[in-house]
Amino acid sequence: PPIRVFGTVGFICSMWAVDLGGMQENAGQFAFSGVLSLLLAAYALTLPACPVSHAAERKSVVEALGLRAFTLFRQKRMALFFIFSMCLGICLQITNGFASPFIFSFGGIPEYADTFGVQHANILISISQISETFCILLIPFFLGRFGIKRVMLIAMLAWVFRFGFFALGNPGSGVWLFVLSMLVYGVAFDFFNVSGSLFVDKETDISIRS
């Protein structure tokens, strides 16, 4: 969990650096990302070796490539889980890729051009990751109280509110709806990812987990 949390903290710091460094609307953000990637690559070389465990028995090509995991689609509950996972994955990429341009687009409207949301869209969006960090702490309680399936349903419903609040908000008088959308993101992302991981761990054989 600490590694997972600090990954999100790094995400937040990068968003703030891009925003405050004036790189939101230019190629500077790619150069910044490239430099960070090189630094992380250099750091990775200092990590201890993690040798792969070589099993005594010989494996077929199918097993070696992990293709046996596709047999899980024969199970109705796993097939449904994978389908919903892909759908929510699409939602995640939409919100990651288009949240900032959507807020920036309000800059073309004089009423919103000088608002904090338009000027600092990345900082506003980073509330999503801040919420994500804190929502991780709620998961043990919700899993114990409601179980894996209900927690997954809560996450799916949260995605509806995430996009609903986002669609209704604006950087001016409706910025509170944007903030609500960011706060709900923590539930939408964390609850499904963690409960989904537990579900897969519970339903699959150890030989095909990843």
Where are these regions (language model features)?
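Helix-to-loop junctions at the C-terminal end of transmembrane segments
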Residues: 21-23, 134-148
